Amino acid sequence: MDYKTLTALKPSEYSDAANGFRAVSDMASAAKDRIDMQIIGAMKSANEGEAATAAEGQLQELAKNFHYTQAECGLISTALDGFAYDMGAAKRKLDAAVEDAHAKNFTVNSDGSVSYPSAGEKTDGKIPEGGTVTALIGDPAADAIGRQAARFNPNPNARYAQEYADRIADALKEATAADEKWAPKLRALKADDDLTVSDRDWVDVKKDTAGVLEGAEDYLHSIKELPKHGTPKENAQW
């Protein structure tokens, strides 16, 4: 995950997509329940014979498909919400660092480095020059030396620029970790190109569920409980 990509990323778009998959999951659930609880029962009461039995079997298979759609779309929704939650945290850190840099009239470059203007007391009649710094995240010893050098720089802007560059790099590191966590989980959420929901499909659902719930732990813990005695507006917001 690089600076330009995270800057352009909009976590809300993934949350919106999650809402769409959640709506499909809900519709599939409703369709499954209607087939199981209403249509099949009505058919049994009104029809008999081989044709009725065959039709009932087809409806049961259709209900299985709706059930599978409900489960898979629910998992995709949760995964997208988890991804948006993790990326949102990283994006807020990035935006805060960039905002602080801009407040000091620094320039954040396309690679995440930070350029700062000349400032400080004159030396030999000259104001200390500005410069550009990159993040000091890697070897602890080298990082410590770099930060110490920034503190002793006659230009006071150097220290602040180094701080902002490090914060930007921290945000990018967090976003990269989120991307690496969620990309394989989302790629795994795919169905076979057929209309038969097999035992193997349900084994995959169970496996996918475990992976998604593990990855979305922080997101799920962030969800507040339904307000007790909440108003209709509060319940809708929840």
Give residue ranges: language-model regions.
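N-terminal secretion-targeting helices of virulence/extracellular proteins
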Residues: 1-200, 204, 214
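Long, low-complexity, intrinsically disordered regions
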Residues: 201-238
